[in-house]
């Protein structure tokens, strides 16, 4: 997704940066995590684990447009990522694109029907979960 820059330290691997970014996310330092995870993405573009963490960092730091693009990139790499669909739906919802959010949230719940998180997101959107018997 990003091109390497001269600021990228050559001795830090994408894995090290991912670990550091995830630690920052855990401590709710979302904007700082985004910076670190962008570096990881430049080193290993298109890696699902990096894209997921980067999307979370963008979303939680109030960068919904960047989160949307990142979760779309994640779904290009891993179309079966139920979290990717959930997170894209949440990003679209935050951007005021509720109609576009619905199908992604429904798909996330269909892929992971036990998820109370996905079910609650659909309910908050005003969409009841569909029965598996519905067409």
Q: Predicted regions span which residues?
A:
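Alpha-helical segment of the N-proximal tetratricopeptide repeat
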Residues: 11-43
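TPR-adjacent "capping" and linker segments in tetratricopeptide-repeat scaffold/adaptor proteins
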Residues: 1-16, 132-134
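Structural signature of tandem alpha-helical TPR/SEL1-like repeats
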Residues: 27-38, 61-73, 95-107, 129-135
